């Protein structure tokens, strides 16, 4: 497109610029129409549309999205409230069932307890019978071993001694009997001879005595000698030893006595055990059955209602805050945008003067005027390079990444992420209130557990009372007999010792064997009996039974453990279903809503990030393309580069010059090299751009001739020198 001359307008209904200008202005470009009207927007018109700047609109769109999210969250919370109240009713019903569990479980537990007691008592009976029989036979065996051993010992000692003594006495008696008779015979013979002589002597004496009237007695020893001849040791001299030998005790009486006395208490115990425990049956009616429980914690409890009301108030407060903040931000965004618009307007006015100057690339001038900020950013970034080609490539890459379409994508992605941030803040505020609901529901669970604990404790106390009474009864009626039997057995052992001692005393009392036999008895039997009595005393002291008592938390332990703070698995709670994320169904409803909103925010964040990455991709495309050409050198005409720029200055009679607004060079034009920018504005000399036909034309047009143009005669501002020695022009900035 070319600026037409003043006499011919391309829009018939609109007068051309300078239509009212005097003839003295012919040959010069008039920047403003005489009446001040322009077809483009002035500063005030531009400022009138500041309120619809992109950031205000984006903030308003973010506000709309946040309000939609808040409304959706309120609707979801309303649904969650209804579901929570329904779940509360379910929890209440389930809690009542849980609290009534002792009523149903106690029957089975009572039967289990009674069966366990009956089985234990039956086993106790068998154990007692076997134990009593075993102890009975063991005691009898030990006592029999003891006294039979003792009997063998002193029978050997006593009978051996008696046999020796009786033999000695018999030999002595036979020797004395035979010797005394022979002595008597010999004495009788001697005495008979002596008596005959003596009698003869007496006869002589008697004859003389008769003269005097008397007589002398005669000597007669026959009777005495006859007695001496018939003298023998009495046969009763060994009758005592024979009697002692024949009267040695065999302890048959002791054995019979001991058998009778020892077996009696054992047999009595067996009889009593059979009578008492033969068909033992536990009285199940003594075990209690707790009553049913009916819990009411949903009616009259505003915990759930207050929670959701608080959440609703929180959402409404958040909506008001977002409305106030975002609207204020949208309004405040108009201030910098207005200032930016003013600066843009001033920059456009300043840079519009470049159009009237001789420019190497009019399209660059149009770009700088129409996009002052992005062009300024490109110029500032390009100023770091001294090579004109690289400066142009840097500016081109920035221009590629900051096109209106690219900036729209960038702003859309940023606005989406900001919207997600606002929604996240709203969701985070709601999430912080969830523990309050968990506390309310935890109170429900505590009520259920308290009911269970009370019912379980009452049942356990009553059941333990029955078990304790049974323990006392068994200890008195069964183990009381054991204690009695051990006492009787100790008494029997004492009687056994006394009876044995009496027999020994009767048999060997007053003899030299008594003391040794008593010492042997004490060593062999007395010490063993004392040991048995010590064992029986221990049995007497420890013979009792204690059945284990039922714990108070029999029915409540599992429920209490499921809601304990150290339970890491939330689904273990009796208020939750398997696989739930929380410990109760009421909180699960709220968590489900939060997860739904969170998933939506996550999806929007992903979409916004994808849009932002799309802009990054666009920017990378420009950067990669610029880098591709960055290290390529300028091509000369012989290598396919463009022809040197020439000028062909023409002017019509009206004093207007055709200023080409295309970036395509015209190598056939006859134009002089572009002069430096001058401070005064007099004329505009331009070259008509006619496309060239070369193999790089299409590529150059796509890239804006980046790296393919001849910038040796690039524009300089008002003839100021370039500090880096670059032929590249920096518009609006002078280098000093």
From Swiss-Prot:
Encoding gene, per UniProt annotation: prm1
Bilayer-crossing regions: 55-75, 138-158, 321-341, 398-418, 604-624
Sequence ranges on the Cytoplasmic membrane side: 76-137, 342-397, 625-736
Record family assignment: Belongs to the PRM1 family.
Cellular compartments annotated: Cell membrane
Superkingdom of origin: Eukaryota
Region (Disordered): 638-675
Name of this chain's protein: Plasma membrane fusion protein prm1
Glycosylation sites: 177, 222, 245, 256, 274, 454, 483, 490, 505, 552, 566
InterPro entries: PRM1
Keyword annotations of the record: Cell membrane, Conjugation, Glycoprotein, Membrane, Transmembrane, Transmembrane helix
GO cellular component labels: mating projection tip; plasma membrane
Membrane topology: Multi-pass membrane protein
Residue ranges that the UniProt entry lists as topological domain Extracellular: 1-54, 159-320, 419-603
Physiological role: Involved in cell fusion during mating by stabilizing the plasma membrane fusion event.
Main location: membrane
GO BP, sorted A to Z: plasma membrane fusion involved in cytogamy
